[in-house]
């Protein structure tokens, strides 16, 4: 449909829908560095050409939680280029915006700000890549919101319960209730749904007249018993769900026969993992809503780098390959070379009809060498395609297929972790590795004081959010709590009794999940507070504080038996940090990257002794060591096991969750009209004008509910 289609009247919402844009992905790569920015430019251009009312993003606008200056600058540049202008906005917000955007310093929609000239508003929830972190719980979307380019909604301020208040929009006679829920850890949100702690508030008046649109960013496919959100958990009054986080493009609305709503999964706009789901052609959606009818038009993205993947099982070609043949390796290389050439030919044919597509495609040939075969040197083989593919280092991946045990063949659990190439394990999470390690570890190395879940959360904060104090603060907090427990119980100072009481206390905390959640939150808040204090104290240093000669520092540090050698012409401004010979860290005194995370001042001589003796240390010795040796450096463990996640979307059937009715009301200023709301069900009356409605072919079915 063209922008001047007669169906696009004054009563029809036109919404451009996209998710998982991942700005900044591989931005330092010489070939793929600009892919995300080019595709984001195309998405915004499609919105402008189709004259949409607004853009709806389903999370993960940024790939990194703390995007680089280049990424943030490019994003702001494109939003300013396409979303600002004199074209009037044709819809109005009639809900209480102080509730919808209450966490913002500017709690109103951006196009109603008199200081801004917005022609295409952007509404977005946050994803798991760009979620709020730090002491102030801010994310990159909050920066865009403060700048006036994005309306960040769907943020939950509580970790115990979630009340989802819709943004109520109206265009002509069409009323749209826009619900959003930013990314929450799946296991926590799953538990909230089970405990009926998630409430979707509804308009109190004229419930039947609203089209209910819900945007969510969670696991849709099953990755574990509670590590996903079943569609059956969602309220049945919803008309359409826009599901982010899953990268495979399934943008055509699919009806859930149990809940009777439709689910659209737009998928990502960039290939972030070389897995089969990413090979599906990428689209964004042009969603039209008129009354209670909707239509989703697929808009192909033409600037996405094409990705071709193919699997080869050597054992399936006994006439070509014999593992006992001394020249079988040369035969396998020739076979793989032929397969890759075929994929390159297919990529070239597709590109001939689309000049906007990048020149070098992504190629992945997965070779199953089980059956007695041996892999060859992949790097040497890949040198043949350096100038022809965008991923020359991992064109071929060798793996061995592992049989799944305990399968009946009737029902497949698509969420079980199976063997997968390490580069394809994009859905594997850090806390899963921690939990899996301690579940399979021997008894003598099992945790006896700390909890697996707490350690998993702390490691995730350290790796994903670069909270360098997360692990240390969690250990310190749980140790302090255990010590208080033992003091209150007046336990005899016998090692056996202390060990037994500590184990009992740990088991009781594991059974009480709410208490364990509180522990993790308290430890993480401590870590964020420490980081904020560190950043504040660092920024408070003046030039006078740092401008004294290093010769003075050398004299002051004589007790440490470390000699500081002043460098030529750079003696001033370095004294308090110590000489460069003490550490390889850059200027500034600490490294906060993922591989270091500990400040230089903590790398004392006692840390090595602590880490070397901690392996066989009893609990009572650990208590003593906390007073004698405050430094904690734990040698990292390497996990070489590769995990594979099946991305199939086959759903298990879950019983419908009963929900309590709740009512609410809100008041607004002259700029934001009032609207009271409730959580009762909707009576769907028969539409008498279906024959005349232009959206009949894609309309929602007529439903009768209490």
From Swiss-Prot:
Top enzyme category: hydrolase
Annotated EC: 3.1.-.-
Any GO molecular function: DNA helicase activity
Localisation: Nucleus; Chromosome; Chromosome, Telomere
Annotated residues for binding of Mn(2+) 1: 20, 22, 60, 247
Biased amino acid composition, Low complexity: 580-589
Regulation: Interaction with SAMHD1 stimulates the double-strand-specific 3'-5' exonuclease activity. RBBP8/CtIP specifically promotes the endonuclease activity to clear protein-DNA adducts and generate clean double-strand break ends. DYNLL1-binding inhibits the activity of MRE11. MRE11 activity is inhibited by C1QBP: in absence of DNA damage, C1QBP interacts with unphosphorylated MRE11, preventing formation and activity of the MRN complex.
Modification after translation (UniProt): Phosphorylated by ATM at Ser-674 and Ser-676 in response to DNA damage, promoting MRE11 activity: phosphorylation activates MRE11 by preventing the interaction between MRE11 and the C1QBP inhibitor. Phosphorylation at Ser-648 by PLK1 primes for phosphorylation at Ser-686 by CK2, inhibiting recruitment of the MRN complex to DNA damage sites.
Keywords, ordered alphabetically: Acetylation, Chromosome, DNA damage, DNA repair, Endonuclease, Exonuclease, Hydrolase, Isopeptide bond, Manganese, Meiosis, Metal-binding, Methylation, Nuclease, Nucleus, Phosphoprotein, Telomere, Ubl conjugation
Consequence of gene loss (knockout): Early embryonic lethality.
Cross-link (Glycyl lysine isopeptide (Lys-Gly) (interchain with G-Cter in ubiquitin)): 339, 481
UniProt cross-link Glycyl lysine isopeptide (Lys-Gly) (interchain with G-Cter in SUMO), position: 384, 468
Annotated Acidic residues bias: 643-653, 684-694
UniProt GO BP: cell population proliferation; chromosome organization; DNA damage response; DNA double-strand break processing; DNA strand resection involved in replication fork processing; double-strand break repair; double-strand break repair via homologous recombination; double-strand break repair via nonhomologous end joining
SUPFAM superfamilies: Metallo-dependent phosphatases
Cofactor(s) required, per the database record: Mn(2+)
Pfam families: Metallophos, Mre11_DNA_bind
Keyword Mitochondrion: no
Entry-linked InterPro entries: Calcineurin-like_PHP_ApaH, Metallo-depent_PP-like, Mre11, Mre11_capping_dom, Mre11_DNA-bd, Mre11_N
Known partners and oligomeric status: Component of the MRN complex composed of two heterodimers RAD50 and MRE11 associated with a single NBN. The MRN complexes dimerize on DNA to form joined MRN-MRN oligomers required for DNA double-strand break repair. As part of the MRN complex, interacts with MCM9; the interaction recruits the complex to DNA repair sites. Component of the BASC complex, at least composed of BRCA1, MSH2, MSH6, MLH1, ATM, BLM, RAD50, MRE11 and NBN. Found in a complex with TERF2. Interacts with DCLRE1C/Artemis and DCLRE1B/Apollo. Interacts with ATF2. Interacts with EXD2. Interacts with MRNIP.
Family the UniProt entry places it in: Belongs to the MRE11/RAD32 family.
Protein's name in the database: Double-strand break repair protein MRE11
């Amino acid at each position: 449909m063209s922008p001047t289609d007669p169906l696009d009247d004054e009563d029809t919402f036109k919404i451009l829908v996209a998710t998982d844009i991942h700005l900044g992905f591989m931005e330092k790569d010489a070939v793929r560095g600009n892919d995300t920015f080019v595709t984001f430019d195309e998405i915004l251009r499609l919105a402008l050409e189709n004259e949409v009312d607004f853009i709806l993003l389903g999370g993960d606008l940024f790939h990194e939680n703390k995007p680089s200056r280049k990424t943030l600058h490019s994003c702001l540049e494109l939003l300013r280029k396409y979303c600002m202008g004199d074209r009037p906005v044709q819809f109005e917000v009639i809900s209480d915006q102080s509730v919808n955007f209450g966490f913002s310093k500017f709690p109103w929609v951006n196009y109603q700000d008199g200081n801004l000239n917005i022609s295409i508003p952007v509404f977005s929830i946050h994803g798991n890549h760009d979620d709020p972190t730090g002491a102030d719980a801010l994310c990159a979307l909050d920066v865009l919101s403060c700048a006036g380019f994005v309306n960040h909604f769907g943020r939950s301020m509580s970790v115990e319960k979630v009340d989802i208040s819709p943004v109520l929009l109206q265009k002509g006679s069409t009323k749209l209730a826009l619900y959003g829920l930013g990314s929450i850890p799946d296991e926590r949100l799953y538990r909230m749904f089970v405990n009926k702690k998630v409430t979707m508030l509804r308009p109190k008046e004229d419930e039947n007249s609203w089209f209910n649109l819900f945007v969510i960013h969670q696991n849709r496919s099953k990755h574990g018993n509670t590590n996903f959100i079943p569609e059956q958990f969602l309220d049945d009054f919803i008309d359409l769900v826009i599901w982010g986080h899953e990268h495979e493009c399934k943008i055509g609305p699919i009806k859930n026969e149990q809940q009777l709503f439709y689910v659209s999964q737009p998928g990502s706009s960039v290939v972030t993992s070389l897995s089969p789901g990413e090979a599906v052609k990428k689209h964004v959606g042009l969603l039209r809503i008129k009354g209670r009818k909707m239509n989703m038009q697929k808009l192909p993205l033409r600037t996405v780098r094409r990705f071709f993947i193919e699997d080869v099982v050597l054992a399936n070609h006994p006439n070509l390959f014999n593992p006992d043949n001394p020249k079988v390796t040369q035969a396998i290389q020739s076979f793989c070379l032929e397969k890759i050439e075929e994929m390159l030919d297919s990529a070239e044919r597709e590109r001939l009809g689309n000049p906007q597509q990048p020149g070098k495609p992504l190629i992945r040939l997965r070779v199953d060498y089980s059956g007695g075969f041996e892999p060859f040197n992949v790097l040497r083989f890949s040198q043949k395609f350096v100038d022809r593919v965008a991923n020359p280092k991992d064109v071929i991946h060798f793996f061995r297929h592992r049989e799944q045990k305990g399968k009946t063949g009737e029902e497949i659990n698509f969420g079980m972790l199976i063997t997968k190439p390490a580069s394809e394990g994009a859905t594997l999470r850090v806390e899963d590795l921690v939990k899996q390690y301690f579940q399979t570890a021997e008894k003598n190395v099992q945790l006896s004081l700390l909890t697996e879940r707490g350690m998993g959360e702390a490691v995730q904060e350290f790796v994903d959010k670069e909270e360098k104090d997360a692990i240390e603060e969690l250990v310190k907090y749980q140790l302090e709590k255990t010590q208080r427990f033992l003091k209150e119980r007046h336990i005899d100072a016998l090692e056996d009794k202390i060990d037994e009481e500590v184990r009992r206390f740990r088991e009781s905390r594991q059974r009480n999940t709410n208490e364990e959640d509180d522990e993790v939150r308290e430890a993480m808040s401590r870590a964020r507070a420490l980081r904020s204090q560190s950043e504040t104290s660092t920024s408070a240093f003046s030039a006078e504080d740092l401008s004294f000669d290093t010769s003075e520092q050398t004299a002051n540090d004589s007790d440490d038996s470390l000699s500081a050698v002043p460098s030529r012409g750079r003696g001033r401004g370095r004294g308090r940090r110590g000489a460069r010979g003490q550490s390889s860290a850059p200027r500034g005194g600490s490294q906060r990257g993922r591989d270091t995370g500990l400040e230089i001042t903590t790398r004392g001589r006692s840390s090595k002794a602590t880490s070397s003796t901690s392996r066989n240390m009893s609990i009572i010795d650990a208590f003593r060591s906390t007073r004698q040796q405050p430094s904690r450096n734990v040698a990292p463990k390497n996990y070489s096991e590769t995990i594979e996640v099946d991305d199939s979307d086959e759903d298990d059937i879950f019983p419908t969750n009963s929900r309590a009715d709740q009512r609410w009301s809100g008041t607004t200023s002259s700029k934001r009209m009032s609207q009271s709301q409730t959580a009762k069900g909707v009576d769907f009356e028969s539409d008498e004008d279906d024959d005349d409605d232009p959206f009949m072919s894609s309309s929602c079915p007529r439903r009768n509910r209490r």
